[in-house]
Design a protein with these regions (language model features):
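Local cysteine-cluster metal-coordination motifs and their immediate loop/turn environment
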Residues: 57, 79-115
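SAM-dependent methyltransferases
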Residues: 119-124
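FNR/FR-type flavoprotein reductase catalytic core
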Residues: 1-81
């Protein structure tokens, strides 16, 4: 389990430790690896069969790229402003590789089709 924080104001650490070894990255270096989760992965030479990630879009892009390079299956949880929450407004679409058979476009609605997607299937 790899988590990133801005500083030493950690939360959920004890809860996460109940599920396995926790590697921490902090932007200011006050706890764990200095930098972000990608720095923690590299510094600790971590390996995985599958990745589950949530967080800011730049991190998800880095995770997606890393997973593709290492041929690791990855699932990412996307966040977006959701005006309606039921898929009607299309305010939360993400571009996909597959064409939606209903709309005939390369989009998925994060609110109804996600929020978790196979990283290979979305373009972020």
């Amino acid at each position: 389990i790899i988590v990133g924080y801005r500083d030493n104001q950690l939360f959920l650490k004890e809860d996460l430790e109940e599920n396995g070894t926790v590697y921490i990255a902090t932007e200011d270096g006050s706890v764990g690896t200095k930098g972000n989760v990608m720095n923690a992965i590299e510094e600790n030479a971590l390996q995985a069969d599958v990745i589950f990630a949530c967080g800011p879009m730049p991190m998800l892009r880095a995770i997606k790229k890393y997973a593709e390079e290492k041929e690791i299956k990855a699932y990412i949880s996307l966040e977006e402003h959701m005006a309606c929450g039921v898929g009607a407004c299309l305010g939360c679409v993400v571009k996909t590789k597959e064409v939606d058979h209903h709309s005939h476009v390369h989009n998925a609605r994060i609110c109804t089709d996600g929020p978790v997607f196979d990283a290979e299937e979305v373009e972020i």
